A protein has these predicted regions:
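Short, surface-exposed loop or secondary-structure junction motifs
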Residues: 2-182
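Glycine-rich phosphate/pyrophosphate-binding beta-alpha loops
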Residues: 111-118, 188-196
Length: 196
């Protein structure tokens, strides 16, 4: 979508989102973090690949996956390029090292809408409040009702082979709550918990 938008408007997705949605609604929400906002962002701490789990990887490799917890089985697959998880996260190699790559200036500045939007809780709440109430506020149109309905309806469900067979559900463009990923009691709630 980003390339199509750039060819039609001459703007990147981050620029377009800022001009048409974030600034008019007063949101501190960026797709590609501007240099002047770096001081407002804290580092993400990679929990799943803590130093302890990293030290355990050689031992984990010797244990059958059926005997491992989900996180440990994912850690085992993550380091094996022959698995779907390992293949996805090694293209390029995505190390959960300190410094953690998503904390780098290059990552934060990159415009990757599915992976590195930066915001604060107030702005995310305001944006999702608008989506939960029809998609428009103060004459600013974010999404139409039909698109929001498609986001709420399950379009895929099952084991996510990239995320270590975690059961997930997705609508169009958004994750939905599932057995392992809670989004509250409303089955139509949509979004993503994020990484930080």
């Amino acid at each position: 979508i980003g390339e199509i938008l750039r060819r039609v408007t001459g703007e990147t997705l981050g620029q377009y989102f800022s001009r048409k949605i974030a600034k008019p609604l007063g949101l501190e929400f960026y797709i590609g973090l501007p240099d002047e906002k770096f001081e407002n962002v804290t580092d993400i701490q990679p929990i799943i690949f803590s130093k302890f789990i990293k030290m355990m990887v050689p031992l984990i490799q010797a244990i059958p996956k059926s005997l491992l917890t989900h996180d440990l089985a994912f850690a085992k697959d993550f380091k094996n390029p022959q698995t779907i998880s390992g293949s996805a996260f090694s293209n390029p190699d995505f190390e959960f090292e300190i410094p953690f790559r998503p904390n780098s200036k290059q990552w934060r500045k990159a415009e990757i809408p599915a992976a590195n939007g930066h915001s604060d809780a107030r702005s995310i709440s305001k944006l999702y409040g608008i989506l939960a109430n029809g998609g428009s506020r103060d004459g600013i149109h974010v999404l139409d009702k039909k698109t929001i309905e498609q986001a709420r309806q399950t379009s895929s469900e099952g084991k996510d082979l990239v995320l270590g067979n975690l059961n997930t559900r997705f609508g169009h463009g958004f994750m939905l709550g599932s057995k392992h990923i809670s989004m509250g009691p409303n089955r139509e709630a949509f979004g993503h918990g994020g990484a930080g």
